[in-house]
Every structure is written in structure tokens, then in C-alpha cells.
Regions:
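N-terminal low-complexity, intrinsically disordered segments
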Residues: 1-50, 56-89, 93
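Short low-polarity hydrophobic stretches
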Residues: 50-51, 110
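Amphipathic alpha-helical binding modules
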Residues: 72-136
């Protein structure tokens, strides 16, 4: 994935891309939470692939504010909507406890990976991430 494609995809995942009629906007990471239709693991792996593609750009002296905002938004809003007991999904009993735990794991992984990339340690950033393996 090119950095340009990763940037565009992250904007869809965060719901900040201006093309709101594109299916990627509705089916992205935050789109799957509002309205809640269940967790889609491929969205998590897609965000992680975007981070890998953008790792060099995120270590520069100047970084793209839209990319950082998208990553921050994904983590912040997923916590507010789906992980927090007062969030719309938990307070309305729309998300199971198992899905809350899984969403929390994903958000922590995205947040941690972003931190290590911004801190300049790409190897450490992806150390605990295991991408999906093809089925035999």
C-alpha cells in the first residue's frame, strides 16, 4: 500500500474523508460502530496496514495533521462510543462484553503502535502485532 492510499483509507476509517457517499466511509473502523453492526476484524488489520505504510512519513520532522487526527479520532471515538460504560453502545446494551474486550484490544494496539512510530521505533511498534494468516 502506498502512503497516499494509506492516508485516504485512514480518513475513511475515521469518518473524516469528504466523500461521505463512498461505501468505505460507512464500512470503516468508526463506521462499523455507528450504527453498530458488529465488529469487523478486517477494519482493525486495515488500520494497522495503513500505519505500516505511513511509518516513514510519521517519523519526519513535519507530519500530516489529517493523518494524526484520523488516528487520534479512531482511538478516542472508539473508546467513547464502544468501550466506555457511558458510551452509546454499552449504555444501550448494543455491544457484547466480548466485543468490548476485542475493541479495547484493537484500540490499545493502534494507540501503542502509533506511539512507537511517532517515537521513532518502528520495529517495536509492530512487535506485538500479528497480522492475519491465510487459511490453509
Amino acid at each position: 500500500m502506498t502512503p497516499e492510499a494509506a492516508r485516504e483509507l485512514l480518513l475513511f476509517h475515521s469518518g473524516t474523508h469528504p466523500c461521505v457517499d463512498d461505501v468505505r466511509w460507512e464500512q470503516g473502523f468508526l463506521g462499523m460502530l455507528r450504527p453498530y453492526r458488529g465488529l469487523r476484524e478486517e477494519n482493525f488489520h486495515s488500520v494497522m496496514a495503513c500505519l505500516r505504510a505511513l511509518a516513514d512519513d510519521l517519523q519526519g520532522d513535519t507530519i500530516d495533521r489529517a493523518v494524526v487526527s484520523a488516528l487520534w479520532g479512531i482511538c478516542h471515538l472508539a473508546r467513547a462510543w464502544g468501550i466506555s460504560p457511558e458510551g452509546m453502545l454499552r449504555s444501550n446494551d448494543l455491544i457484547s462484553g466480548d466485543d468490548v474486550s476485542r475493541l479495547q484490544d484493537w484500540v490499545e494496539q493502534i494507540s501503542s503502535t502509533t506511539f512507537f512510530i511517532l517515537d521513532g521505533d518502528v520495529d517495536e511498534a509492530f512487535d506485538s502485532y500479528g497480522p492475519p494468516q491465510p487459511e490453509a
